[in-house]
From Swiss-Prot:
Source organism of the structure: Oryza sativa subsp. japonica (Rice)
Name under which the protein is recorded: Growth-regulating factor 11
Domain annotation WRC: ranges: 180-224
Gly residues composition-biased segments: 43-52
GN (gene name): GRF11
Keyword Transcription belongs to the record: yes
Region (Disordered): 1-71, 212-269
Location in or out of the cell: Nucleus
Listed Low complexity bias regions: 255-269
Amino acid sequence: MAAEGEAKKDSASNPPGGGGGGGGGEEEEDSSLAVGEAAVGVGEAGGGGGGGEKADREEEEGKEDVEEGGVCKDLVLVEDAVPVEDPEEAAATAALQEEMKALVESVPVGAGAAFTAMQLQELEQQSRVYQYMAARVPVPTHLVFPIWKSVTGASSEGAQKYPTLMGLATLCLDFGKNPEPEPGRCRRTDGKKWRCWRNAIANEKYCERHMHRGRKRPVQLVVEDDEPDSTSGSKPASGKATEGGKKTDDKSSSSKKLAVAAPAAVEST
């Protein structure tokens, strides 16, 4: 384009018909125009090549972004609904898991090589169930649920035979929210944090020390001897005699008062 502008300026400064010098100027103009067009063509070719390379690079970068997850930015991940659990049951299961971890950690190295962590957990759970059964206390449901799930999940027959825990009434399960945490222990408390550490009597709630509380103590009856002594036998007779003498004295004194009062009344009349 710059070459065309220069050619136009030269043509304007040297109008046609200027003689031989004018003819020489036309040849120079034609050569300059050819050179300018060639330069412009080379520049366009170079620019087109550079633009093509840039386009290729942009396409490659776009492909890389797509492969790295650029498309995932437009997607919305929808998570499955989490079932809501009972907070008390979740806390009980969490406490049980912590106890299992502490039990596994307390086992010396090499001592529990015959049992795996899951087997130790199952043994501990069964021992706790046995404690409730030995104390004749209803077994909490959070201790029975894992066993029930393992039985029903092992085969289809178990699921058909025990579809729910409601049919297992003979196990005396505790469906309440406050199960007994330590079966077999005395339940005497001060209403706050303290609790008696002694073991309860069989089929009872309290230990020997706290069994008398809350019950009426029997009244002790005084039993007299059946064989009266000689001295004791004479005393009642003397007492009766004195009582009879007192009664006769009272009668005599009352009669005297009446006798004295009667003549006084006659004299006054």
